[in-house]
Amino acid sequence: MFTYYFQGLALGAAMILPLGPQNAFVMNQGIRRQYHLMIALLCAVSDLLLICAGIFGGSALLMQSPWLLALVTWGGVAFLLCYGFGALKTAFSQSLELANAEVMQQGRWKIIITMLAVTWLNPHVYLDTFVVLGSLGGQLAVEPKRWFALGTISASFLWFFGLALLAAWLAPRLRTARAQRIINIVVGAVMWFIAFQLAREGVSHIQALLN
């Protein structure tokens, strides 16, 4: 059974490692040392729920609801554009320290809501957990399926806590004005790139539905 566990662990790591909205948010909270472990836990728990839903039957709902997929896609596009704009606005702010100070004054609930939006409004999360993991895990018997799910869940917990702790450890070097400007530019550019990719997919989905 450990074979299925390590298969899930490897696949989960491969899907979670690329820079995306979740990773960028966890990294920034780690650099600020602002509720970073709480955010890592909430991201990992969100992944746990999505992984279990995808592997244990939720993929059928998404595949049978193309309009739901289109709605999630365009909601994600709107959010990523706004998130990227905020990062770029901070990067090119004349007073970067003032902009960072305003971010540091955000309350816990605002940070939690942003994290939930980053996770649950990202269509790639549903494609990864419902389509990829759902199609692979759905082919397994009950016991191997549980070990496969446990492996992918382990990858999420290890990655998010590792990223948050590493970012907090490197915070003294990454809190400089130059480093913060570079990080915000990269995050903003990546968010907009993902948003435009999703928009193309969203247009294709709508065209397919209307034909």
Swiss-Prot record:
The keyword Magnesium does not apply. It comes from the Bacteria. It catalyses: L-arginine(in) = L-arginine(out). GO terms for cellular component: plasma membrane. GO terms for molecular function: L-arginine transmembrane transporter activity. It is a multi-pass membrane protein. Its main location: membrane. The keyword Cell inner membrane applies. The chain crosses the membrane at residues 1-21, 37-57, 68-88, 111-131, 147-167, 179-199. Signal peptide: none annotated. Keywords: Amino-acid transport, Cell inner membrane, Cell membrane, Membrane, Transmembrane, Transmembrane helix, Transport. It is found in: Cell inner membrane. Involved in the export of arginine. Important to control the intracellular level of arginine and the correct balance between arginine and lysine. Belongs to the LysE/ArgO transporter (TC 2.A.75) family. This is Arginine exporter protein ArgO. It comes from Klebsiella pneumoniae subsp. pneumoniae (strain ATCC 700721 / MGH 78578).
